[in-house]
Amino acid sequence: MSQDVREVNFDGLVGPTHNYAGLAHGNVASMRHGGLTANPREAALQGLAKMKSLMEAGFAQGVLPPQQRPDLGALRDLGFTGDDAGVLAQAARQAPQLLRAVCSASSMWTANAATVTPSLDAPDGRVHFTAANLQSSFHRYLEPRTTARVLAAMFHDPAHFAHHPVLPATPTFSDEGAANHTRLCGDHDEPGVHLYVYGRQAFGGEHGPKRYPARQTLEASQAIARQHGLDDTRTVFAQQHPDAIDAGVFHNDVIAVGNGPVLLYHEMAFRDETATLEALRARMSTPLIPVRVPSEAISLEDAVATYLFNSQLLSNPDGSMTLVVPGECQENETVWRTIQDLLLGGNNPISEVLVKDVKQSMRNGGGPACLRLRVALAARERQALTGRVLLDEALHDDLAAWVERHYRDRLAPEDLADPLLVRESLTALDELTQLLGIGAVYPFQLN
């Protein structure tokens, strides 16, 4: 029975305060580019261009709005007082790193927004959402409350959508969302198996990274599977290789990407590669198609530098697949040759590679896959969405014009204390919620 299920990629709009603050420990690109001058307008338009090109290629594309930044409420909670200008000036003088954190536009990476289970797999026949607590870093810990509000506004109809509490924001339940989750299936309109990848086990775990933190726990992944009603026949929990995390693979989507029955991964993606593949094969009703990239072909360092595995793997109507890679892959001769010989030339469904320029995002450590949250939706569920959140040409043009009106083309670290930036951002976001038709979702609209 066909339900016309389509996977929709909901990309995050880059916010007006996009900057390079070097906030993310363990994210090599973010740390390397901290302090550079950013171009928020270019970043947002690059993201929109990627969305539009995929929409024009026939893929279903959605939009998620950015967060309210600077988060002056967070600064006030931390003891800074006075009017907005005074709070900004105090923070810039006394704690510049905190100011940079509350201005972060990191919500653009919607792969970390939530973990999603489609209605095909859920016992109650609804789409299930759990916004990620992102407790590993302060600048991202600020996101979940607004994220949950945005998701509840867009996916509002309780007949079709279920929203679960964010997990407790403690190291035990550290959760970074869909960046550590892949659904494997024969096709998007068939039941799937959920691969949850964790970096460490809070209770009783022995193996973990030594250099950089593991941001996802087994306990968090298990809790989300329970919330969504998934049993052992639909779930596989696999540990990410600690050496990969120490090489800068801070999420599993930096070292592996799955779509349909295909799992494209680096040989260092999982601590126990054989057991992971066997567990998937035992649960899947369709044969798994593993596409393994050995270290001899691409080193961990090149995988992190080019974000090959942070590509989007998308299904075409004829059963073939398109791989959407960042421009950095084409610039690296070794990686580009491997794409041609091993991926396009191999015995797998990958038949096309599209190269996208997302440099403004890449400098903060986010490739094409970081920028999107995958949600498989039946026709009735797409019709139940609130507002204008599925991209068409008119919405793209409206959003591009909105960016041109409101975004700066230059934002240096010293600009973050400018009180005008607050006013500009709130004006832009207020207009955006009207443009998208999702109602009041931001703190300044609710207070």
Swiss-Prot record:
One of the GO biological process terms: arginine catabolic process to glutamate
Lineage, broadest ranks: Bacteria, Pseudomonadati, Pseudomonadota, Gammaproteobacteria, Oceanospirillales
Assigned keywords, A-Z: Arginine metabolism, Hydrolase
Gene3D superfamilies (alphabetical): Succinylarginine dihydrolase
Record: active site: 176, 251, 370
Quaternary structure (record): Homodimer.
A Pfam family of this chain: AstB
Keyword Transferase part of the UniProt annotation: no
Catalytic activity: N(2)-succinyl-L-arginine + 2 H2O + 2 H(+) = N(2)-succinyl-L-ornithine + 2 NH4(+) + CO2
Classification via SUPFAM superfamilies: Pentein
Similarity comment: family membership: Belongs to the succinylarginine dihydrolase family.
Disulfide bonding pattern of the chain: none
Alphabetized NCBIfam families for the sequence: arg_catab_astB, PRK13281.1
Protein's recorded name: N-succinylarginine dihydrolase
EC annotation from Swiss-Prot or TrEMBL: 3.5.3.23
Keyword presence, Transcription regulation: no
Protein function: Catalyzes the hydrolysis of N(2)-succinylarginine into N(2)-succinylornithine, ammonia and CO(2).
The protein's annotated pathway: Amino-acid degradation; L-arginine degradation via AST pathway; L-glutamate and succinate from L-arginine: step 2/5
Gene Ontology molecular functions: N-succinylarginine dihydrolase activity
Class of enzymatic activity (EC top level): hydrolase
Binding site for substrate: 21-30, 112, 139-140, 215, 253, 364
Signal peptide: none
